[in-house]
Amino acid sequence: MNWINKVTPPGLKTMMSKKDTPDDLWVKCPASGELIYRNDLEQSWYVTPAGAHLRISPRMRFRILFDDERWEPISLPQVPLDPLKFKDDKPYPARLKAAKAKILNRDIKETEDGGAPLLQEDCMVAAYGKIGGVPAVVLVQDFEFMGGSLGMAAGEAFITAAQLALARKSAFVVCTASGGARMQEGTLSLMQMPRTTLAINDLADAKLPYVVVLTDPTSGGVSASYAMLGDVHIAEPGAMIAFSGPRVIEQTIRESLPKGFQRSEFLREKGQVDIVVDRRKLKATVARVLGHLLPMSRRRDDRSTLQLTPPKTHAPKPPEPKVKPD
Protein backbone atom coordinates (compact mmCIF):
# COMPACT_ATOMS: atom_id res chain seq x y z
CA MET A 1 0.00 0.00 0.00
CA ASN A 2 1.21 3.50 -0.79
CA TRP A 3 2.37 5.41 2.32
CA ILE A 4 0.19 8.37 1.31
CA ASN A 5 -2.91 6.19 1.62
CA LYS A 6 -1.89 5.32 5.19
CA VAL A 7 -1.77 8.94 6.36
CA THR A 8 -4.66 10.36 4.29
CA PRO A 9 -7.97 10.61 6.21
CA PRO A 10 -10.89 8.70 4.58
CA GLY A 11 -12.91 11.89 4.00
CA LEU A 12 -10.04 13.53 2.14
CA LYS A 13 -9.62 10.40 0.03
CA THR A 14 -13.24 10.71 -1.08
CA MET A 15 -12.79 14.38 -1.98
CA MET A 16 -9.63 13.64 -3.92
CA SER A 17 -11.27 10.79 -5.83
CA LYS A 18 -14.16 12.89 -7.12
CA LYS A 19 -13.88 14.10 -10.67
CA ASP A 20 -14.94 17.73 -10.52
CA THR A 21 -13.68 18.74 -13.97
CA PRO A 22 -16.16 18.15 -16.82
CA ASP A 23 -14.99 16.15 -19.82
CA ASP A 24 -16.00 18.89 -22.25
CA LEU A 25 -14.39 21.86 -20.50
CA TRP A 26 -12.04 22.48 -23.44
CA VAL A 27 -12.86 22.37 -27.14
CA LYS A 28 -10.33 21.96 -29.94
CA CYS A 29 -10.63 24.39 -32.83
CA PRO A 30 -10.83 22.44 -36.13
CA ALA A 31 -9.14 25.30 -37.99
CA SER A 32 -6.14 26.07 -35.77
CA GLY A 33 -5.95 23.13 -33.37
CA GLU A 34 -6.09 25.54 -30.42
CA LEU A 35 -7.77 24.42 -27.20
CA ILE A 36 -10.49 26.89 -26.24
CA TYR A 37 -12.28 27.23 -22.93
CA ARG A 38 -15.93 26.29 -23.47
CA ASN A 39 -17.28 29.28 -21.55
CA ASP A 40 -15.37 31.58 -23.90
CA LEU A 41 -16.91 29.76 -26.86
CA GLU A 42 -20.40 30.25 -25.47
CA GLN A 43 -19.79 33.98 -25.25
CA SER A 44 -18.92 34.05 -28.96
CA TRP A 45 -21.78 31.74 -30.03
CA TYR A 46 -19.28 28.93 -30.67
CA VAL A 47 -17.19 30.84 -33.19
CA THR A 48 -13.49 30.20 -32.53
CA PRO A 49 -10.78 32.91 -32.67
CA ALA A 50 -9.68 31.37 -35.99
CA GLY A 51 -13.18 31.92 -37.40
CA ALA A 52 -14.39 28.31 -37.38
CA HIS A 53 -18.14 28.03 -36.83
CA LEU A 54 -18.84 25.01 -34.63
CA ARG A 55 -22.19 23.24 -34.66
CA ILE A 56 -24.69 24.48 -32.12
CA SER A 57 -28.00 23.33 -30.67
CA PRO A 58 -31.49 24.53 -31.67
CA ARG A 59 -31.80 26.34 -28.35
CA MET A 60 -28.71 28.39 -29.12
CA ARG A 61 -30.06 29.15 -32.61
CA PHE A 62 -33.22 30.52 -31.03
CA ARG A 63 -31.20 32.57 -28.56
CA ILE A 64 -29.19 34.06 -31.42
CA LEU A 65 -32.16 34.93 -33.63
CA PHE A 66 -35.09 35.90 -31.42
CA ASP A 67 -35.45 39.31 -29.79
CA ASP A 68 -34.62 39.27 -26.05
CA GLU A 69 -34.02 35.49 -26.39
CA ARG A 70 -37.77 34.93 -26.03
CA TRP A 71 -39.83 32.56 -28.13
CA GLU A 72 -42.97 30.45 -28.15
CA PRO A 73 -42.36 26.71 -28.72
CA ILE A 74 -44.39 25.13 -31.50
CA SER A 75 -45.88 21.70 -30.89
CA LEU A 76 -45.06 19.33 -33.74
CA PRO A 77 -47.16 16.31 -34.81
CA GLN A 78 -46.29 12.72 -34.00
CA VAL A 79 -45.63 10.23 -36.81
CA PRO A 80 -45.33 6.41 -36.97
CA LEU A 81 -41.94 5.48 -35.53
CA ASP A 82 -40.98 2.52 -37.69
CA PRO A 83 -43.37 2.02 -40.62
CA LEU A 84 -40.92 -0.17 -42.58
CA LYS A 85 -39.75 -2.26 -39.58
CA PHE A 86 -36.22 -1.37 -40.64
CA LYS A 87 -33.27 -3.09 -38.99
CA ASP A 88 -29.53 -3.03 -39.71
CA ASP A 89 -27.15 -3.83 -36.86
CA LYS A 90 -29.81 -2.51 -34.45
CA PRO A 91 -33.56 -1.78 -34.81
CA TYR A 92 -34.59 1.68 -35.96
CA PRO A 93 -36.62 2.39 -32.75
CA ALA A 94 -33.48 1.69 -30.72
CA ARG A 95 -31.57 4.26 -32.78
CA LEU A 96 -34.33 6.81 -32.21
CA LYS A 97 -34.31 6.12 -28.48
CA ALA A 98 -30.54 6.58 -28.27
CA ALA A 99 -30.72 9.82 -30.27
CA LYS A 100 -33.45 11.21 -28.00
CA ALA A 101 -31.44 10.33 -24.88
CA LYS A 102 -28.39 12.12 -26.30
CA ILE A 103 -30.40 15.24 -27.10
CA LEU A 104 -32.13 15.18 -23.70
CA ASN A 105 -28.77 15.11 -21.89
CA ARG A 106 -27.61 18.10 -23.91
CA ASP A 107 -30.84 19.96 -23.19
CA ILE A 108 -30.51 19.31 -19.46
CA LYS A 109 -27.02 20.84 -19.49
CA GLU A 110 -28.23 23.87 -21.41
CA THR A 111 -31.09 24.52 -18.98
CA GLU A 112 -29.08 24.22 -15.76
CA ASP A 113 -29.21 28.02 -15.34
CA GLY A 114 -32.92 28.19 -16.13
CA GLY A 115 -35.22 27.72 -19.08
CA ALA A 116 -37.74 25.13 -20.12
CA PRO A 117 -36.62 22.01 -22.02
CA LEU A 118 -37.37 21.90 -25.73
CA LEU A 119 -38.93 18.42 -25.57
CA GLN A 120 -37.33 17.56 -28.90
CA GLU A 121 -38.71 14.40 -30.53
CA ASP A 122 -36.72 14.37 -33.78
CA CYS A 123 -34.23 16.49 -35.71
CA MET A 124 -36.57 19.47 -36.21
CA VAL A 125 -37.46 22.08 -33.58
CA ALA A 126 -39.77 25.03 -34.27
CA ALA A 127 -40.57 28.25 -32.43
CA TYR A 128 -42.38 31.55 -32.98
CA GLY A 129 -41.13 34.98 -32.00
CA LYS A 130 -39.79 38.24 -33.37
CA ILE A 131 -36.54 38.96 -35.17
CA GLY A 132 -35.76 42.65 -35.16
CA GLY A 133 -39.43 43.29 -34.45
CA VAL A 134 -40.58 41.16 -37.39
CA PRO A 135 -42.83 38.18 -36.48
CA ALA A 136 -41.29 34.94 -37.69
CA VAL A 137 -41.56 31.18 -37.42
CA VAL A 138 -38.09 29.65 -37.09
CA LEU A 139 -37.44 25.98 -37.84
CA VAL A 140 -34.05 24.57 -36.83
CA GLN A 141 -32.59 21.29 -38.03
CA ASP A 142 -30.41 19.54 -35.45
CA PHE A 143 -27.46 17.62 -36.90
CA GLU A 144 -26.84 15.92 -33.55
CA PHE A 145 -30.08 13.96 -33.97
CA MET A 146 -29.21 11.20 -36.45
CA GLY A 147 -27.28 13.59 -38.65
CA GLY A 148 -30.31 15.85 -39.11
CA SER A 149 -31.65 13.29 -41.58
CA LEU A 150 -34.92 14.08 -43.33
CA GLY A 151 -37.71 11.68 -42.45
CA MET A 152 -41.45 11.74 -41.90
CA ALA A 153 -41.17 13.59 -38.59
CA ALA A 154 -38.98 16.28 -40.14
CA GLY A 155 -41.31 16.61 -43.12
CA GLU A 156 -44.36 17.02 -40.89
CA ALA A 157 -42.47 19.53 -38.76
CA PHE A 158 -41.59 21.60 -41.82
CA ILE A 159 -45.17 21.61 -43.12
CA THR A 160 -46.61 22.43 -39.68
CA ALA A 161 -44.22 25.35 -39.22
CA ALA A 162 -44.91 26.66 -42.74
CA GLN A 163 -48.67 26.47 -42.18
CA LEU A 164 -48.32 28.39 -38.92
CA ALA A 165 -46.37 31.09 -40.76
CA LEU A 166 -49.23 31.26 -43.26
CA ALA A 167 -51.86 31.48 -40.52
CA ARG A 168 -50.00 34.24 -38.68
CA LYS A 169 -48.92 36.08 -41.84
CA SER A 170 -45.33 35.94 -40.62
CA ALA A 171 -41.94 35.22 -42.13
CA PHE A 172 -40.55 31.68 -42.26
CA VAL A 173 -36.88 31.11 -41.44
CA VAL A 174 -35.27 27.67 -41.70
CA CYS A 175 -31.77 26.80 -40.43
CA THR A 176 -30.61 23.68 -42.26
CA ALA A 177 -28.09 21.07 -41.09
CA SER A 178 -28.44 17.60 -42.55
CA GLY A 179 -26.68 14.67 -44.14
CA GLY A 180 -29.71 13.99 -46.36
CA ALA A 181 -32.70 11.66 -46.37
CA ARG A 182 -33.12 9.12 -43.56
CA MET A 183 -32.32 5.70 -44.99
CA GLN A 184 -34.30 3.86 -42.29
CA GLU A 185 -37.51 5.28 -43.79
CA GLY A 186 -36.74 4.58 -47.43
CA THR A 187 -39.14 6.07 -49.98
CA LEU A 188 -41.19 7.62 -47.17
CA SER A 189 -38.26 9.93 -46.44
CA LEU A 190 -37.87 10.86 -50.12
CA MET A 191 -41.57 11.78 -50.21
CA GLN A 192 -40.82 14.67 -47.87
CA MET A 193 -38.88 16.49 -50.60
CA PRO A 194 -41.93 17.27 -52.78
CA ARG A 195 -44.16 17.73 -49.73
CA THR A 196 -41.93 20.46 -48.31
CA THR A 197 -41.71 22.04 -51.77
CA LEU A 198 -45.51 22.33 -51.90
CA ALA A 199 -45.49 24.03 -48.50
CA ILE A 200 -42.96 26.55 -49.82
CA ASN A 201 -45.19 27.19 -52.84
CA ASP A 202 -48.04 28.09 -50.49
CA LEU A 203 -45.80 30.66 -48.80
CA ALA A 204 -44.86 32.10 -52.19
CA ASP A 205 -48.53 32.35 -53.21
CA ALA A 206 -49.22 34.28 -50.00
CA LYS A 207 -46.20 36.51 -50.69
CA LEU A 208 -44.61 35.63 -47.35
CA PRO A 209 -40.81 35.59 -47.10
CA TYR A 210 -38.97 32.30 -46.83
CA VAL A 211 -35.35 32.71 -45.73
CA VAL A 212 -32.88 29.83 -45.48
CA VAL A 213 -29.81 29.87 -43.23
CA LEU A 214 -27.42 27.22 -44.55
CA THR A 215 -25.17 25.75 -41.85
CA ASP A 216 -22.57 23.01 -41.84
CA PRO A 217 -23.38 20.55 -43.31
CA THR A 218 -26.34 20.87 -45.67
CA SER A 219 -26.36 17.99 -48.12
CA GLY A 220 -28.27 15.20 -49.83
CA GLY A 221 -32.02 15.39 -50.24
CA VAL A 222 -32.21 18.50 -48.06
CA SER A 223 -29.94 20.48 -50.40
CA ALA A 224 -32.01 19.14 -53.32
CA SER A 225 -35.27 20.46 -51.88
CA TYR A 226 -36.21 23.10 -49.32
CA ALA A 227 -32.65 24.22 -48.51
CA MET A 228 -32.19 25.80 -51.95
CA LEU A 229 -35.72 27.11 -52.52
CA GLY A 230 -35.57 30.20 -50.33
CA ASP A 231 -36.19 33.79 -51.34
CA VAL A 232 -32.81 34.59 -49.77
CA HIS A 233 -30.01 32.14 -48.94
CA ILE A 234 -27.70 33.08 -46.08
CA ALA A 235 -24.77 30.79 -45.27
CA GLU A 236 -22.39 30.55 -42.35
CA PRO A 237 -18.66 30.74 -43.18
CA GLY A 238 -17.06 27.44 -44.15
CA ALA A 239 -20.34 25.52 -44.30
CA MET A 240 -20.36 22.50 -46.61
CA ILE A 241 -23.35 22.77 -48.95
CA ALA A 242 -23.61 19.91 -51.41
CA PHE A 243 -25.63 17.03 -52.77
CA SER A 244 -22.81 14.48 -52.68
CA GLY A 245 -19.67 14.99 -50.62
CA PRO A 246 -16.34 15.92 -52.26
CA ARG A 247 -14.77 12.53 -51.55
CA VAL A 248 -17.59 10.71 -53.37
CA ILE A 249 -17.29 13.05 -56.35
CA GLU A 250 -13.52 12.66 -56.58
CA GLN A 251 -13.82 8.88 -56.50
CA THR A 252 -16.44 9.03 -59.26
CA ILE A 253 -14.76 11.45 -61.69
CA ARG A 254 -11.19 10.48 -60.66
CA GLU A 255 -10.12 14.11 -60.54
CA SER A 256 -9.19 16.53 -57.80
CA LEU A 257 -11.75 19.20 -56.98
CA PRO A 258 -10.97 22.93 -56.69
CA LYS A 259 -9.91 24.26 -53.30
CA GLY A 260 -12.90 25.16 -51.15
CA PHE A 261 -15.27 23.30 -53.47
CA GLN A 262 -18.81 23.03 -52.01
CA ARG A 263 -18.04 25.48 -49.22
CA SER A 264 -20.26 28.50 -48.66
CA GLU A 265 -17.71 31.01 -49.97
CA PHE A 266 -17.27 29.00 -53.19
CA LEU A 267 -21.04 28.83 -53.71
CA ARG A 268 -21.39 32.55 -53.13
CA GLU A 269 -18.90 33.20 -55.93
CA LYS A 270 -20.96 30.91 -58.20
CA GLY A 271 -24.24 32.60 -57.32
CA GLN A 272 -25.89 29.78 -55.36
CA VAL A 273 -25.67 31.63 -52.05
CA ASP A 274 -26.66 35.27 -51.62
CA ILE A 275 -24.49 36.17 -48.65
CA VAL A 276 -22.04 34.55 -46.22
CA VAL A 277 -22.47 35.96 -42.71
CA ASP A 278 -20.58 35.49 -39.47
CA ARG A 279 -22.86 33.94 -36.86
CA ARG A 280 -22.37 36.91 -34.55
CA LYS A 281 -23.93 39.15 -37.22
CA LEU A 282 -26.61 36.68 -38.28
CA LYS A 283 -29.53 38.18 -36.37
CA ALA A 284 -28.90 41.68 -37.70
CA THR A 285 -28.66 40.33 -41.25
CA VAL A 286 -31.83 38.23 -41.01
CA ALA A 287 -33.71 41.13 -39.41
CA ARG A 288 -32.64 43.46 -42.22
CA VAL A 289 -33.71 40.95 -44.88
CA LEU A 290 -37.09 40.33 -43.25
CA GLY A 291 -37.62 44.06 -42.83
CA HIS A 292 -37.36 44.45 -46.60
CA LEU A 293 -39.37 41.34 -47.51
CA LEU A 294 -42.23 41.72 -45.02
CA PRO A 295 -43.52 45.32 -45.11
CA MET A 296 -44.74 46.80 -41.84
CA SER A 297 -48.31 47.07 -43.13
CA ARG A 298 -48.49 43.27 -43.57
CA ARG A 299 -47.23 42.29 -40.11
CA ARG A 300 -50.44 41.16 -38.49
CA ASP A 301 -49.00 40.92 -34.97
CA ASP A 302 -47.86 44.54 -35.03
CA ARG A 303 -51.00 46.17 -36.40
CA SER A 304 -52.35 47.09 -32.98
CA THR A 305 -49.20 49.07 -32.17
CA LEU A 306 -48.53 50.66 -35.54
CA GLN A 307 -48.54 54.43 -35.70
CA LEU A 308 -50.37 54.71 -38.99
CA THR A 309 -50.33 58.08 -40.63
CA PRO A 310 -53.90 59.00 -41.64
CA PRO A 311 -54.35 59.71 -45.33
CA LYS A 312 -54.23 63.31 -46.34
CA THR A 313 -57.67 64.77 -46.97
CA HIS A 314 -58.51 67.94 -48.75
CA ALA A 315 -61.21 70.19 -47.35
CA PRO A 316 -64.00 70.80 -49.82
CA LYS A 317 -63.77 74.09 -51.60
CA PRO A 318 -66.34 76.64 -50.46
CA PRO A 319 -69.01 77.30 -53.05
CA GLU A 320 -68.29 80.25 -55.24
CA PRO A 321 -70.56 83.21 -54.50
CA LYS A 322 -73.26 83.74 -57.01
CA VAL A 323 -72.94 87.03 -58.79
CA LYS A 324 -76.20 88.69 -59.71
CA PRO A 325 -76.22 90.02 -63.23
CA ASP A 326 -76.54 93.79 -63.54
UniProtKB/Swiss-Prot annotation:
The keyword Lipid biosynthesis applies. Residues 298-326 are annotated as: Disordered. InterPro entries: AcCoA_carboxyl_beta (IPR034733), Acetyl_CoA_COase_Trfase_b_su (IPR000438), ClpP/crotonase-like_dom_sf (IPR029045), COA_CT_N (IPR011762). It is found in: Cytoplasm. Pathway: Lipid metabolism; malonyl-CoA biosynthesis; malonyl-CoA from acetyl-CoA: step 1/1. Residues 25-308 form the CoA carboxyltransferase N-terminal domain. Its EC number is 2.1.3.15. It comes from the Bacteria. The keyword Transferase applies. It catalyses: N(6)-carboxybiotinyl-L-lysyl-[protein] + acetyl-CoA = N(6)-biotinyl-L-lysyl-[protein] + malonyl-CoA. Its main location: cytoplasm. GO terms for molecular function: acetyl-CoA carboxylase activity; ATP binding; carboxyl- or carbamoyltransferase activity. GO terms for cellular component: acetate CoA-transferase complex. Residues 317-326 have a biased composition (Basic and acidic residues). Keywords: ATP-binding, Cytoplasm, Fatty acid biosynthesis, Fatty acid metabolism, Lipid biosynthesis, Lipid metabolism, Nucleotide-binding, Transferase. GO terms for biological process: fatty acid biosynthetic process; malonyl-CoA biosynthetic process. Belongs to the AccD/PCCB family. Acetyl-CoA carboxylase is a heterohexamer composed of biotin carboxyl carrier protein (AccB), biotin carboxylase (AccC) and two subunits each of ACCase subunit alpha (AccA) and ACCase subunit beta (AccD). Component of the acetyl coenzyme A carboxylase (ACC) complex. Biotin carboxylase (BC) catalyzes the carboxylation of biotin on its carrier protein (BCCP) and then the CO(2) group is transferred by the transcarboxylase to acetyl-CoA to form malonyl-CoA. This is Acetyl-coenzyme A carboxylase carboxyl transferase subunit beta. It comes from Hyphomonas neptunium (strain ATCC 15444).
